[in-house]
Amino acid sequence: MTRGVPGTHDIDLMLKFFKKIKSKKFRSLEVPKFNKAMDDRCKKSLWYKLKFRPDVVIFEGWCVGAKPQTAKQLKKPINSLEKVYDQGLKWRTHVNNQLKTKYKTLFNQLDGLLYLKAKNFNLLRNWRLKQERKLW
């Protein structure tokens, strides 16, 4: 199971969502439902149907609010995967460019950002494994 890194999301769809819920002419809206086991959206008949504008939207994701790195920061691999498989910086540069452009536009739609910090990486790993076991 993977996690979608910047550059793998439908930013245009998310921007349309925020535009519609902020519109004074809001009527109704279909919101995609994502199936993590399939790593894709559910069929449209299973999407959520909003009949009223929500008072609050919780926009959740591991990379929400992530900032791009500087060119200097980008050159230093942060893990063995980057060190071994991205020596030419192709992947890191692509993700970073996404954060500088489309994702910046998306994150500017947010009124606030709440960050939950786990005590350690093993706890995150255990939460993820527990979640993924439920998918299968």
Regions found by a protein language model. Give the residues of each.
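Acidic active-site catalytic centers that drive phospho-/nucleotidyl reactions
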Residues: 10, 60, 111
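Conserved NTP phosphate-binding and transfer environment spanning the P-loop NTPase/kinase superfamily
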Residues: 63-136
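Switch II (G3) loop of P-loop NTPases
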Residues: 57-63
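Short gly/ser/thr-rich secondary-structure transition/capping motifs
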Residues: 36-43, 93-99
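Glycine-rich phosphate/ribose-binding loops and adjacent secondary-structure elements
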Residues: 44-51
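Loop/turn-to-beta-strand initiation segments
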Residues: 26-28, 53-57, 112
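Conserved nucleotide-sensing/catalytic segment adjacent to the nucleotide-binding pocket
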Residues: 1-39
